[in-house]
């Protein structure tokens, strides 16, 4: 998980292995820990930082309570924080799930950006889908993050300069 990504990079990357390690992957489940990404970025600038898994799990044994806007805010917060601290790529674990939040072999059913109801044969695009879309639509492949700031900690923001010279700001 993210809180140990710096420690793990220090353990894995040395003079012998530095040419064999292209990046480090992490998950988001233990909290923000954005400062650990910044530490990896500063001490290992050549490494890719890859958020390789994240999802919003339903509480086990409880009715599937969906707070779609809260989940969308969680995604936006994580994407902005990770980008602002050196992340190179971000992957969701479950982009598309069924109406139960599965299928899943261990019973940890999840909410997802796209939910397909196999009973009614309908597709629902959740707010998480649109949050992910805001980043992918405006921050293009090959973009470089540029500095930005916010007047309030309640307004999170990131910015990047795209290869065509345009600047994308995502709030």
Language model segments and positions:
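Short amphipathic alpha-helical segments with coiled-coil-like heptad repeat character
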Residues: 32-33, 139-143
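Loop/turn elements at helix/coil->beta-strand transitions in domains of secreted/extracellular proteins
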Residues: 19-22, 44-48, 85-90, 141, ...
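Carbohydrate-binding surface patches
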Residues: 137, 148-171
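Generic recognition of flexible, low-complexity loop/linker segments
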Residues: 36-39, 77-80, 155-159
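Aromatic/acidic polysaccharide-binding cleft in carbohydrate-active enzymes
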Residues: 51-133, 146-150
């Amino acid at each position: 998980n993210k809180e140990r990504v710096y420690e793990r990079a220090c353990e894995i990357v040395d003079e012998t292995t530095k040419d064999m390690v292209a990046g480090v992957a992490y998950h988001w489940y233990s909290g923000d820990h954005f400062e650990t990404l910044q530490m990896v970025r500063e001490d290992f600038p050549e490494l890719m930082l890859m958020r390789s898994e994240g999802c919003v799990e339903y509480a086990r044994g409880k009715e599937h309570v969906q707070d779609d806007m809260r989940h969308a805010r969680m995604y936006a917060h994580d994407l902005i924080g990770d980008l602002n601290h050196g992340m190179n790529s971000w992957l969701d674990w479950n982009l598309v799930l069924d109406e139960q939040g599965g299928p899943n072999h261990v019973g940890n059913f999840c909410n997802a950006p796209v939910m397909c109801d196999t009973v009614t044969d309908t597709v629902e695009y959740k707010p998480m889908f649109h949050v992910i879309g805001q980043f992918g639509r405006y921050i293009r492949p090959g973009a470089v993050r540029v500095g930005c700031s916010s007047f309030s900690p309640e307004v999170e923001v990131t910015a990047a300069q795209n290869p065509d010279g345009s600047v994308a700001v995502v709030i």
